[in-house]
């Protein structure tokens, strides 16, 4: 169904999934609905949908395709599968991370130790016991450090263990039982290892009871040094429990999901509680998302837990999802409980998750994102510029010229979209260079058109860019040119003039302007990229001069340049100097000497 032909009667009232596509057939957005007619109709009502991205989405949508299903559960599953297939721009899509941070105990060694690992499959076996997954490598390292303080197990490699003849410093620090030199029995070591396993399983109360019994037993047997080790371990665990308020969560496995939106930014944060301990947070920012909160969260949960080897007993969400089938889609054997508590410690966790999401959104927005509100005010830009290209060029006295553009897309630099153009004859003239680069960039539209282009220069460069786009019959692309103030060219906080469609004569922005700083960041990245490509071209031309000499390939050229520093000096080298270069044959030397004679004759002529 084409958007321009839309009438509500054309859409069925059944549950299903709808795909919104642009004029090229690319899927922009995928949604689900209990009643397709009611849902799709809201997109065509002025007050029907208050989400900020909907006007941008509808401007680009030319057709809407529907797929009917039997019920809401089928719609949810189909939506998730189609999102994974099409990767639509306005939906949430997570990267498929198939490795996890875990702790493992290898059972193949007579004196096992605990290691941090990354693995795809989290299943214990006869060869090893695996605990996790944990939110990060740092969480694993922190847990290992705690274990080494509480449970004096070995941490050395198997090779070091086999070669050790006396105990290391960890034994002196009471952080290892020194099984390498048999200063403990197998029974003592296994007892300590069992306590560490209980700790990793979250059975802290059992550890405390065992330690109290061990202290009493060791004291009765007058093993006072061993009793002291047990006592210190007991105190460390009790202190840690007091500091971390472990008892709050009753040793549960819980994930709390926080959601925060601001302008074009959406951040979802997952707080992970395992065995009553808050292990950390993972943040998932989405720059372009047009889903409602319930659709966003259900889609996120399906994708997130599809990549997790285990689901927690409880998943706390900021709003009720009211999808009874969702827990069974996550784990049909032991479905988690999905709830949205309004009081108690569950509410505290949700508040903490939302605050984390808010901080992450605001810090990333301040540091890197586009200041859209200021842009709307100054540039009078009604539409959000999803793709911005910034152009620059570099040359050395007219030689080795390159023109480049970098891409800022979806609120981040996109290095894979950067492009370079070799400029041979026009590098002396910035205006001609910009004209050539823009013409070549837009002559074959193999990549997406930008919403805005930014160039380094003043009014002349701005006018040249506008003229070139007009010649190419390209409309709807904003042009911004940024010029440094001549008298303050080297100042760190410099005044700059901005030339744009609303201010073709230029407007001066304060150095503290977020918009100015954003454009400066784009220009600096384009300049860095241009300089790097220019230097690479100079080096390549130096390494591979236009005159090819038979037998002198890349390896031999590098050896010659390492010795003589430049090709000009190579052409002045004596036969003896050339013979000292490893790898050069007599024929190679004859070719080089002949080339020297040829060049000298050309110089004389």
Swiss-Prot record:
One of its GO terms (molecular function) is excinuclease ABC activity. Coiled coil: none annotated. Residues 205-240 form the UVR domain. HAMAP family: UvrC. Belongs to the UvrC family. This is UvrABC system protein C. SMART domains: GIYc. One of its GO terms (cellular component) is cytoplasm. The UvrABC repair system catalyzes the recognition and processing of DNA lesions. UvrC both incises the 5' and 3' sides of the lesion. The N-terminal half is responsible for the 3' incision and the C-terminal half is responsible for the 5' incision.
């Amino acid at each position: 169904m084409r958007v321009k032909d839309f009438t509500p009667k054309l859409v069925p009232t059944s549950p299903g999934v709808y795909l919104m596509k642009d004029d090229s057939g690319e899927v922009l957005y995928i949604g689900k609905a209990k009643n397709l007619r009611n849902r799709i109709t809201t997109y065509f009502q002025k007050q029907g949908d208050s989400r900020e991205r909907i006007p941008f989405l509808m401007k680009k949508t030319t057709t809407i395709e529907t797929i009917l299903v039997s019920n809401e559960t089928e719609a949810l599953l189909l939506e998730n599968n189609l999102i994974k297939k099409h990767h639509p721009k306005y939906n949430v899509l997570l990267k498929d991370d198939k490795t996890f941070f875990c702790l493992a105990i290898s059972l193949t060694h007579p004196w096992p130790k605990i290691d941090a690992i990354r693995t795809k499959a989290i299943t214990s076996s006869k060869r090893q016991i695996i605990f996790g997954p944990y939110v990060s490598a740092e969480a694993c390292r922190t847990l290992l450090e705690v274990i080494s303080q509480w449970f004096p197990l070995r941490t050395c490699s198997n090779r070091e263990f086999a070669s050790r003849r006396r105990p290391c410093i960890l034994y002196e620090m009471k952080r290892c039982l020194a099984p390498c030199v048999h200063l403990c029995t197998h029974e003592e070591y296994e007892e300590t290892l069992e306590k560490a396993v209980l700790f990793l399983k979250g059975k802290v109360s059992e550890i405390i009871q065992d330690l109290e019994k061990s202290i009493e037993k060791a004291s009765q047997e007058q093993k006072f040094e061993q009793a002291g080790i047990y006592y210190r371990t007991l105190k460390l665990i009790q202190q840690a429990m007091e500091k971390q308020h472990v008892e709050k969560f009753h040793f549960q496995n819980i994930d709390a999901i926080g959601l925060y939106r601001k302008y074009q930014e959406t951040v979802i944060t997952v707080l992970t509680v395992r065995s009553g301990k808050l292990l950390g947070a993972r943040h998932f920012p989405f720059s372009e998302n047009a889903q409602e909160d319930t659709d966003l969260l259900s889609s996120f949960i399906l994708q997130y837990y599809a990549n997790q080897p285990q689901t927690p007993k409880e998943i706390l969400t900021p709003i009720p999802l009211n999808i009874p089938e969702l827990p069974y889609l996550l784990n049909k054997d032991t479905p988690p409980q999905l709830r949205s508590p309004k009081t108690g410690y569950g509410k505290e966790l949700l508040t903490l998750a939302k605050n984390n999401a808010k901080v992450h959104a605001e810090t990333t927005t301040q540091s890197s994102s586009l200041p859209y509100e200021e842009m709307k005010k100054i540039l009078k830009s009604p539409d959000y510029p999803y793709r911005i290209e910034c152009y620059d060029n570099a040359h050395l006295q007219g030689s080795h010229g390159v023109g480049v553009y970098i891409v800022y897309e979806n609120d981040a630099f996109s290095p894979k979209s950067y492009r370079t153009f070799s400029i041979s004859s026009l590098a002396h003239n910035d205006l001609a260079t910009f004209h050539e680069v823009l013409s070549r960039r837009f002559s074959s539209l193999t990549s997406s058109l930008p919403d805005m282009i930014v160039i380094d220069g003043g009014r002349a460069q701005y006018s040249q860019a506008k003229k070139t786009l007009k010649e190419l019959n390209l409309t709807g692309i904003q042009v911004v040119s940024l010029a440094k103030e001549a008298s303050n060219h080297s100042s760190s906080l410099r005044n700059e003039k901005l030339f744009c469609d609303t201010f073709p004569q230029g407007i001066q922005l304060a150095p503290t302007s977020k918009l100015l700083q954003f454009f400066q960041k784009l220009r600096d990245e384009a300049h860095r990229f241009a300089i790097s490509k220019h230097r690479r071209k100079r080096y390549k031309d130096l390494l591979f001069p236009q005159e090819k000499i038979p037998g002198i390939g890349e390896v031999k050229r590098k050896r010659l340049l390492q010795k003589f520093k430049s090709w000009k000096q190579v052409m002045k080298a004596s036969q003896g100097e050339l013979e000292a270069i490893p790898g050069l044959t007599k024929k190679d030397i004859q070719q080089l000497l002949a080339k020297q004679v040829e060049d000298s004759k050309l110089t004389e002529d």
